[in-house]
Amino acid sequence: MLKKLKVVRLLVNHLIYCPSIFMPYSKNMKKKIWNKTSLGALFMLFGTALTACSNSGFEANLTSLNQLRTSASKNTNLTQNKADLVTALKSAFENNPEGTTRVLLDAWKFTLLDAQILEKQDFSKFSKSFGSGRSIEDVEPSAGVRGLRLVERYTQDTANIINNVIKLDKQKVEAFSIQYKDPKNFRVQVKINAKGNYKKDTVKTYLSQVGLSDGDLNDTGTLEAEIIYTYMPPAASFFSASKFDKLTRAINFNTNLRIQIIGKDSVMTKLLQQSSFVKQLADQKFQDQSINLLPYVLYSIL
């Protein structure tokens, strides 16, 4: 009898911390459990309660990035196994699509704006999040060849020429705004201030190709631009549970993208306004761009 009483007390005390699972029970639950349940059944019920509570975590109703961080601190497998993290986030999305999507976007924002991944990466976290062999070029958005979609705009050779002349390798995220209602109604905008240095001797081979003359450049100088990335809903392939891919360890968020570049110095302004070769960089749209949000989630909770 004494052993049974201890089990009942332990079970009821545990249920206090997980009340939502047992809401149908009345205030006399303790008495009913005592009168009608065998000791073996009590152990089974207690085990069920433990499992239900432990599995209800953030998957039941994910609403904030801090909630995800708390769960990750208690279950380190979430940060050590990307497939498990994708599975858990998919479950969270199925239970609360809007809340989970907002958390994923908040993780993207945190990684770029607050953690300043473009400016001062934590290399250990970067490798764990994005994978070994990855670089800033793999961050979305960025002012590199991939981030500016140079290969999609031009041939590979032309993209290389432009990158040799306009190499904006110092980046700072100045703003990151999110407006989200549902997969068909959202707007994410990121503003990056990008700077670079040039040496006339290094780029003079390409001057005529990009619409500049020798007199447009000093022997050395700087380039500066504001780059605005605006992400809008795609025409199809909207965000859904099917975008959580355990096999490839990815959470694919599809968008239509507009990239605008505004020159902040005379050389960059002239390139964007007068050079037929370069001016299409100033404003261009790209359809169905897929962004893997998983690395940003992982980077923000490590």
Swiss-Prot record:
Keywords for the protein's UniProt record, in alphabetical order: Signal
Family: Belongs to the MG439/MG440 family.
Any single Pfam family the record assigns to this protein: Lipoprotein_3
Signal among keywords: yes
Source domain of life: Bacteria
Residues spanning the signal sequence: 1-52
Designated name of the protein: Uncharacterized protein MPN_643
InterPro entries: Lipoprotein_3
